[in-house]
Amino acid sequence: MGRSFEVRKASMAKTAGAKIKVYSKYGKEIYMCAKNGGGDPDMNLSLKHLIAKAKKDQVPAHVIDKAIDKANGGGGEDYTPARYEGFGPGGTSVIVDCLTDNGNRTFQDVRQCFVKVGAKIGVEGSVSHMFDHQAVFQFKGEDDEIILETLMMEDVDVTDVELEDGVITVFAPHTEFFKTKTALNGAFPDLTIDVEEITFVPQTHTPVAGEDAEKFQKFLDLLDDCDDVQQVYHNGEL
């Protein structure tokens, strides 16, 4: 019983720690979004989307409300976005997005994640040209043609529509996010969108195996442990 309890306790602590990190990241992002664009979701579409995304990831309402109240109060920290690019284990390409109140600290923290696995942080533009900045929507369906026709009729600049195993994925330029979402919701009011995000989609994937795969997973875990890291994009295929 003693050993199993210790293992269970460690697992619970890890789960709790992961939840706290998710809450913290969303809290910071919601705070900055509300501070820059206003705390009313009906007037700030970016905030409205972010709140919906947070709820989907089971972020408690009190975390969301606290971040918005903090922004409305006019006080608090002033975070700025920071993006780092580099080459991860196995020749992978990596983009790391952060929100920081101390750029020097954040750069050193992210750089150490690269260094610890023998990877190399690069300069701005070193790998971002290998990704497409896209709005991505994913939902269950079988008729990708009707989705494409509908979006084109609504004058949405669609990049691609894919159908695989009963799941439709819509790609559009990141600037077309809200236009695409509005068109889908308007044409298909009963549609449940499982994924709706702005992301960096790799143009090609790099297979990672063996020792490189272990290093790559460690690398992702190290970045996940950085308080200022909000999102990591990569082309690694484990």
Curated annotation (Swiss-Prot):
Pfam families to which the protein is assigned, alphabetical: TACO1_YebC_N, Transcrip_reg
GO cellular component terms, A-Z: cytosol
Predominant localisation class: cytoplasm
Compartment list: Cytoplasm
Keywords: Cytoplasm, DNA-binding, Transcription, Transcription regulation
InterPro entries per UniProt: Integrase-like_N, TACO1_YebC-like_2nd/3rd_dom, TACO1_YebC_N, Transcrip_reg_TACO1-like, Transcrip_reg_TACO1-like_dom3, YebC-like
Family: Belongs to the TACO1 family.
HAMAP family: Transcrip_reg_TACO1
Protein name in UniProt: Probable transcriptional regulatory protein VIBHAR_07036
Organism of this sequence: Vibrio campbellii (strain ATCC BAA-1116)
Top-level taxonomy: Bacteria, Pseudomonadati, Pseudomonadota, Gammaproteobacteria, Vibrionales
